[in-house]
Amino acid sequence: MHPKRKQRLILVLFVVLVSSVGVSLTLYALNENINLFYPPTKIVNGEAPSGRTIRAGGCVVPGTVTRAKDNLEIDFDVTDGVSELSVTYDGILPDLFAEGEAVVLTGMLDHDGVFVATKVLAKHDENYMPPEVADTVTTDGVEHMKTCKGISYDS
């Protein structure tokens, strides 16, 4: 093989190798940091991964919010109009958090099927619902308004 060709081949192989390593590292980093959104029905049906950070959302079921007296732990249920998901959160809730309102949660599903939230986001005005929640808030295949009004909370 001609020395000039050999040098060019080595350079091309080196560039391909470095590019492959770069793409692999980027995909690995993205895979570790992506939090997929799951509605309560998919989580209850076991379609969401256990032990991995995910996002969930729905409407807070009225009458299910219980606060601990000696710490910041709060337990409540979230529904998409079909299934209810039990949630526990240890921290300060957003000011707009309320029963019957939309929330998006980030956290993990524990072995008992309880969603342990590390972050709670509440809606920011009276007509807003996060797009992920709005797409999943259905009952019998019929979409409700883009808020939690009109959802039947008796699952």
Swiss-Prot record:
Function summary: Heme chaperone required for the biogenesis of c-type cytochromes. Transiently binds heme delivered by CcmC and transfers the heme to apo-cytochromes in a process facilitated by CcmF and CcmH.
Membrane topology, Cytoplasmic segments: 1-8
Keyword Ribonucleoprotein: no
Main location, first listed in the record: membrane
Full protein name: Cytochrome c-type biogenesis protein CcmE
Disulfide topology: none
Coiled coil: none
Source organism (scientific name): Teredinibacter turnerae (strain ATCC 39867 / T7901)
Keywords from the UniProt entry: Cell inner membrane, Cell membrane, Cytochrome c-type biogenesis, Heme, Iron, Membrane, Metal-binding, Signal-anchor, Transmembrane, Transmembrane helix
Family: Belongs to the CcmE/CycJ family.
Record localization: Cell inner membrane
Taxonomic lineage of the native organism: Bacteria, Pseudomonadati, Pseudomonadota, Gammaproteobacteria, Cellvibrionales
NCBIfam families for the chain: PRK13254.1-1, PRK13254.1-3, PRK13254.1-5
